């Protein structure tokens, strides 16, 4: 519950009737004394400024006017003649004043409307009729009750006669359903219902002994129900009445500790009632059931008026005599306020604490168990993820029972249908039909071309398909026709083999040799050169005729020797190209390439086909791509499809597409976009073509919106998006596209496509296709931030309930000892010992309860079960050195430790902070009441926490009505009067804390007298080993140590208690508390003669120090039927002489108290003196603590804050350079660095080592370190 604004006035108030920004009118309370003892009385108007987030500035009145007297009541109503309504004031001098609110705000001098003095005494209450705002009822002294009409204010009429009523009317209220019914309450206890129509009494309630009535209120919905309250401190009661039975109240509400002064029934919800009174409290009730929901912050003086806002019931105001009117809300919007004030009180000490507590209002926090009625909805619906709609509707009208219904929902059914069709076709592998269908349905030529190209890529020979798409298959047929007209057969041109012509002996030539002169004479000449073996001709020739040129002779000699390269060089030098090519054919590939290169170098000015041929022959198609005119891009593309190497094909296509893209940008010719898209598709360059497709998507979407008649913009956008995703999907399958950037974290080439994938996944998920959405999200890189969120959302939506494991239980112990329940005995038992007993379970009276293993939940409160994962936000459950299968309480005080006789098998060391047996702690008694105390027996439950435990989800106890925070009371050793504590088993071994605690007992009931405060520690035998033990530092967080009282007939001398740290509020005790908390402390009686004759028992060694609490007083063992009875260890020194007699009279606290520890060098919170070697500890741990605080669940705020406070103790030690030795500081620095590196195992190992081997340095701060390790591990 949050206090939104405060008005610094002791005044009665009224809310403005308008629904706009709320205003409050205040009138100086009659009889109240201001802080400056001023007697000025006035009417003021205040603008609360609730729309302003800054609530730190003090409010100032927006209008003010002086009055002749103080106010007992104020009312504000709507008026047709006054824009802001009329304010009516009930003055102490009997005057009824009316003001125009609008004129007051504007500062007009004639703001007062009228002043009527019909009442002979003070007007105590007034109210406007809720149905007829012109009717005003006023009641006051001597039973005077008037009804005034604002239209005729000078002539009110009176209800009742003077003789009938002589007591004062303290309160009144109009019926909310029947306009002419009015109820009044008087100081004499009369609750009278009036019928204003007949001007007579209707009935009078039998008000339980005629107790004075301070407030009345009608039920806002039921016209026969009303509530009354009494201002008596002896009977602070609220009565719920039903007029159908006026002899007795229907229900009585009890919760106030002093008289009730004001009631306010919420007009919008009859289940909400506010009451305030003399106990400084404002309580919220359910008057229908009598349940008290909770109380609002307690102030420091009477709360005499509380009112709901009439139009916005989220707000209400409460006026008190501490000089404030508090405007609050029932919503928990700032739950950290309570903790902030509690922390502030925690840091105060001594006089500062009590001085602050007198003026500091207390805070409280509670939540309504059900939503207020104005927030309830008879039906509601919301869209859920995954194409679902969740709707809630009432099963039956008038009953608080709803039916939840989840139904599928599709924004656009066409989207879902097309998605299913496409995914089905993909599964069947029928990609060609998809392309054909999409091409036929394409809305533009560009889109149609894209689908045609993709269809070509799907074919068995993609390059041939692309050539056919470009139209060059038809051109090849046309060229063949032209060759046929020249007398050449198509087969002759394209065939790989040459066939002999009939009759002529001529041979056909290959296509690439068509550049040479192809004539019959040349063919005949060549054929004649090849003769068969031994063939003779009639044409003899000479190798050398003598007429040859020198070049011809050189060629001939080279040929004779088979040196074709030299012959080729000579032929090329002489520019005999025909001879050179023939020689090159004989010389092999190297000679051919050399001849071709020479030829093309000579043809620079020749036909264009020679350059193309040069690029083809030289396998350098980059020249064609970069230099060919873009008007012939199709021809270039055809050449690439025909001759390009597979390794270069994609890059060549991309380069050609880039050239087309540059021309698009320079000329803004959108027609070329289709051509560039073709090139990128042919080269499988998805990142390039996607950018164009997305641009087309926007254009097509805009055109669709402009031309669509019935479609919505969402449907148009989704269809365009779906078309893009389909094209990309088919293209990726057709080209076997592999995304190599999925492992990158940023700078993706396909970033635009990834965004579309995420958008499309969201669309299909909205239509309930979660599998499809996940499929496309898996195509997005793992490190993409939006995709990661979307993937997690999909996985959560698709996650099915995991099969329930069969929970196995831990088998109970095979042998269970029969243990009798402890009996209350008025005499302490004699200390006897028996044989050692096996280790007992956690509860000595019942077998252990098996608990199923549960998964670790870092935010759930721990259950008391063995072998359970720890909760990083809950109190520590076991010691770091030796884990224990039990949940321990870090806040419980350490009980006294005894000694172990020889032969006793000690149990395992428990967690630090476990309370020992005997002397279970009980809380300080609550407020006094008339109830008598009752004795409560022990319980056999094993998982009940002690009263001083810190439970998960605990709530703070109600504070005193003076608003002073309670301090820790002195520990009570036994909850039963005249009863010594009874031990249930033998004492623990020396140096080791006990493993069990005594069963918890409930706090004592309220008593009329508080218990006496013990002011000195107990006296007794002091072992030499304890004389020099230094007192531990005061722990502001742990409970005070406690010990059971020593039996009066016990012969064993009581060991001296180790001195505990001083309390900031009370002196150290000098004696153990008495067994009867209502009796003075008795002196220890003389030792029993029977026990005095026995051998003296050696004193027990001091108990091990606990890092959680100050060292408690050591306790001797007492008789137990379960304790071992072996002789004491021989190595322990035996006591010499008889036991000590009774101690002397306790001295003063100052004389008995040990020397207090030296004050720290520097004040708490100072961090300027931390040494350099310890500074990493402070910096790392404090930074990680802040990270945990910002992310930990709010339900664990108390545990987080406690861990932070304990860390501050460590930082104070580091700042003062005390307690921690250099090697411990070095280890803590290593631990901090391990936490920073999230190496929690190393941090835990270091923590265990320090806890185990350096316990003298482990104060209260070590618990904070352990908690931080667990919390940091669980906090993302």
Swiss-Prot record:
Question: Does the record carry Protein transport as a key word?
Answer: yes
Q: How does it sit in the membrane?
A: Peripheral membrane protein
Give one GO molecular function term. Answer: structural molecule activity
* Compositionally biased spans, kind Polar residues: 928-945
User: Ranges of Low complexity compositional bias?
Assistant: 865-885, 957-985, 1016-1028, 1079-1096
The UniProt keyword set, sorted, is: Cytoplasmic vesicle, Endoplasmic reticulum, ER-Golgi transport, Membrane, Protein transport, Repeat, Transport, WD repeat
Localization, UniProt: Cytoplasmic vesicle, COPII-coated vesicle membrane; Endoplasmic reticulum membrane
What are its GO biological-process terms? COPII-coated vesicle cargo loading; endoplasmic reticulum organization; protein transport
Comp. bias intervals (Pro residues): 828-850, 1000-1015, 1097-1115
Any Pfam family matching the protein: SRA1
User: InterPro entries from the xrefs?
Assistant: SEC31-like (IPR040251), SRA1/Sec31 (IPR009917), WD40/YVTN_repeat-like_dom_sf (IPR015943), WD40_repeat_dom_sf (IPR036322), WD40_rpt (IPR001680)
Spans of repeat WD? 5-47, 66-109, 118-158, 164-204, 208-251, 255-295, 298-338, 382-407
Q: Which domain of life is it from?
A: Eukaryota
Coiled coil location: none
Gene Ontology cellular-component terms for this entry are:
COPII vesicle coat; endoplasmic reticulum exit site; endoplasmic reticulum membrane
Q: Where is this region: Disordered?
A: 820-885, 906-1171
| Quaternary structure, from the entry | The COPII coat is composed of at least 5 proteins: the sec23/24 complex, the sec13/31 complex, and the protein sar1. sec13 and sec31 make a 2:2 tetramer that forms the edge element of the COPII outer coat. The tetramer self-assembles in multiple copies to form the complete polyhedral cage. Interacts (via WD 8) with sec13.
Q: Which family does it belong to?
A: Belongs to the WD repeat SEC31 family.
**Job description of the protein:** Component of the coat protein complex II (COPII) which promotes the formation of transport vesicles from the endoplasmic reticulum (ER). The coat has two main functions, the physical deformation of the endoplasmic reticulum membrane into vesicles and the selection of cargo molecules.
Q: What is this protein called?
A: Protein transport protein sec31
């Amino acid at each position: 519950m949050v206090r939104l604004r405060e008005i610094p006035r002791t005044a009665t108030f009224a809310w403005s009737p308008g629904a706009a920004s709320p205003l409050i009118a205040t009138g100086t309370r009659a009889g109240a004394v201001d802080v400056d003892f001023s007697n000025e009385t006035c009417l003021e108007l205040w603008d609360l400024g609730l729309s302003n987030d800054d609530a730190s500035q003090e409010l100032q009145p927006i209008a003010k006017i002086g009055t002749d007297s103080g106010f007992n009541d104020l009312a504000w109503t709507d008026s047709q003649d006054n824009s802001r309504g009329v304010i009516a004031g009930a003055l102490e001098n009997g005057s009824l004043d009316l003001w125009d609110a609008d004129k007051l705000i504007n500062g007009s001098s004639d703001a007062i409307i009228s002043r009527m003095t019909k009442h002979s005494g003070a007007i105590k209450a007034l109210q406007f009729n809720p149905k007829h705002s012109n009717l005003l009822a006023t009641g006051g002294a001597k039973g005077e009750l008037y009804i005034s009409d604002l239209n005729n204010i000078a002539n009110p009429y009176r209800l009742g006669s003077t003789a009938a009523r002589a007591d004062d009317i303290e309160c009144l209220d109009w019926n909310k359903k029947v306009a002419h019914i009015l109820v009044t309450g008087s100081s004499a206890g009369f609750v009278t219902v009036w019928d204003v129509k007949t001007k007579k009494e209707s009935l009078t309630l039998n008000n339980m002994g005629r107790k004075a009535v301070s407030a009345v209120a009608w039920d806002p919905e039921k016209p026969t129900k009303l509530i009354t309250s009494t201002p008596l401190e002896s009977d602070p009661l609220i009565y719920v009445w039903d007029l159908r039975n006026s002899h007795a109240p229907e229900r009585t509400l009890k919760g106030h500790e002093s008289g009730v002064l004001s009631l306010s029934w919420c007009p919008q919800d009859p289940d909400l009632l506010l009451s305030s009174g003399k106990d400084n409290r404002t309580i919220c009730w359910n008057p229908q059931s009598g349940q008290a929901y909770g109380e609002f912050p307690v102030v420091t003086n009477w709360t005499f008026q509380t009112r709901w806002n009439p139009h916005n019931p989220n707000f209400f105001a409460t006026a008190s005599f501490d000089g404030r009117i508090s405007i609050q809300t029932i919503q928990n919007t700032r739950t950290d306020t309570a903790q902030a004030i509690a922390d502030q009180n925690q840091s105060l000490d001594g006089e500062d604490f009590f001085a602050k507590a007198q003026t500091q209002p207390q805070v409280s926090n509670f939540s309504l168990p059900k939503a207020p009625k104005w927030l309830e909805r008879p039906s509601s619906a919301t869209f859920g993820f995954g194409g679902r709609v969740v709707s809630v509707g009432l099963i039956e009208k008038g009953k608080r029972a709803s039916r939840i219904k989840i139904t599928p929902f599709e924004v656009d059914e066409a989207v879902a249908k097309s998605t299913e069709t496409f995914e089905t076709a993909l599964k069947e592998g029928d990609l060609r039909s998809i392309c054909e269908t999409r091409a036929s349905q394409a809305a533009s030529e560009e889109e149609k071309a894209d689908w045609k190209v993709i269809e070509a890529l799907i074919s068995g020979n993609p390059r041939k398909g692309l050539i056919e798409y470009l139209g060059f298959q038809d051109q090849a047929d046309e060229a063949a026709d032209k060759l046929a007209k020249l007398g050449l057969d198509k087969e002759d041109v394209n065939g790989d083999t040459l066939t002999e012509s009939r009759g002529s002996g001529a041979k056909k030539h290959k296509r690439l040799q068509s550049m040479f002169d192809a004539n019959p004479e040349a063919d005949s000449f060549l054929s004649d050169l090849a003769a068969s073996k031994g063939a003779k001709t009639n044409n003899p020739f000479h190798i050398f005729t003598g007429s040859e040129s020198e070049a011809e002779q050189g060629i001939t000699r080279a040929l004779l020797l088979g040196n074709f390269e030299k012959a080729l060089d000579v032929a090329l030098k002489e520019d005999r190209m025909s001879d050179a090519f023939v020689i090159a054919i004989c010389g092999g590939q190297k000679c051919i390439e050399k001849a071709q290169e020479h030829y093309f170098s000579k043809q620079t000015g020749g036909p264009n086909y020679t350059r193309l041929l040069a690029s083809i022959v030289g396998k350098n198609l980059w020249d064609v791509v970069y230099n060919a005119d873009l008007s012939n891009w199709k021809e270039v593309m055809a050449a690439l499809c025909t001759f390009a190497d597979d390794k270069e094909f994609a890059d060549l296509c991309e380069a050609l597409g880039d050239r087309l893209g540059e021309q698009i940008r320079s000329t803004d010719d959108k027609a070329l976009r289709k051509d560039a898209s073709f090139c990128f598709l042919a080269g499988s360059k998805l990142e390039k073509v996607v950018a164009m497709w997305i641009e087309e998507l926007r254009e097509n979407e805009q055109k669709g919106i402009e031309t669509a008649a019935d479609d919505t913009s969402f449907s148009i956008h989704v269809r365009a998006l779906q078309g893009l995703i389909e094209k990309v999907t088919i293209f990726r399958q057709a080209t076997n596209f592999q995304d190599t950037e999925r492992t990158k974290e940023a700078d993706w080439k396909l970033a635009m496509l990834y965004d579309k994938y995420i958008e499309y996944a969201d669309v299909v998920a909205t239509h309930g296709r979660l599998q499809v959405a996940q499929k496309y999200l898996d195509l997005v890189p793992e490190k993409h931030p939006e995709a990661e969120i979307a993937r997690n959302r999909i996985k959560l939506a698709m996650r099915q309930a995991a099969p329930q494991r069969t929970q196995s239980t831990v088998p109970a112990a095979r042998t269970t000892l029969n243990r009798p329940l402890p009996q209350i005995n008025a005499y302490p038992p004699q200390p006897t010992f028996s044989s050692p007993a096996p280790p007992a379970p956690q509860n000595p009276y019942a077998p252990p309860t098996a608990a199923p293993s549960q998964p670790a939940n870092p935010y759930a409160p721990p259950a008391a079960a063995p072998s359970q994962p720890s909760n990083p936000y809950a109190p520590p459950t076991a010691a770091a050195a030796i884990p224990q299968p039990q949940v321990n309480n870090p806040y419980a005080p350490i009980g006294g430790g005894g000694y172990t006789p020889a032969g006793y098998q000690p149990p395992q060391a428990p967690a630090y902070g476990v309370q020992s047996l005997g002397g279970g702690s009980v809380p300080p008694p609550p407020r006094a009441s008339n109830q008598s105390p009752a004795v409560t027996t022990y319980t056999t439950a094993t998982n009940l926490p002690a009263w001083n435990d810190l439970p998960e989800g605990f709530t703070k106890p109600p504070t005193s009505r003076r608003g002073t925070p309670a301090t820790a009371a002195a520990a009570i050793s036994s909850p039963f009067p005249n009863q010594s504590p009874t031990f249930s088993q033998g004492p623990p071994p020396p140096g080791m804390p006990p493993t069990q605690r005594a069963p918890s007992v409930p706090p004592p009931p309220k008593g009329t007298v508080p218990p006496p405060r013990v002011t000195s520690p107990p006296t007794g035998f002091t072992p030499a080993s304890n004389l020099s033990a230094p007192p531990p530092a005061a722990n502001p967080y742990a409970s005070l140590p406690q010990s059971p009282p020593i039996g009066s007939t016990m012969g064993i001398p009581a060991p001296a208690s180790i001195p505990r740290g001083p309390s900031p509020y009370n002196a150290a005790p000098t004696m153990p508390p008495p067994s009867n908390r209502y009796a003075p402390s008795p002196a220890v009686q003389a030792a029993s003669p029977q026990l005095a004759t026995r051998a003296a028992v050696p004193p027990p060694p001091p108990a091990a120090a606990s890092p959680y609490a100050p060292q408690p007083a050591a306790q001797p063992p007492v008789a137990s039927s379960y304790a071992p009875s072996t002789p004491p260890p021989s190595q322990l020194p035996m006591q010499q002489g008889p036991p000590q007699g009774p101690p002397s009279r306790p001295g003063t606290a100052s004389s008995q108290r040990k020397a207090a520890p030296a004050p720290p060098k520097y004040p708490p919170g100072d961090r300027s003196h931390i040494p350099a070697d310890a500074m990493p500890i402070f910096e790392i741990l404090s930074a990680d603590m802040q990270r945990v605080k910002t992310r930990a669940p709010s339900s664990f705020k108390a545990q987080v804050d406690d861990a932070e406070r304990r860390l501050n103790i460590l930082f104070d030690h580091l700042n003062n350079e005390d307690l921690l030795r250099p090697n411990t500081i070095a280890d803590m620095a290593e631990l901090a660095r391990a936490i920073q590196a999230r190496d929690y195992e190393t941090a835990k190992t270091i923590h265990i080592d320090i806890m185990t081997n350096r316990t003298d340095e482990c104060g209260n701060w070590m618990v904070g370190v352990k908690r931080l390790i667990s919390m940091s591990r669980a906090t993302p």
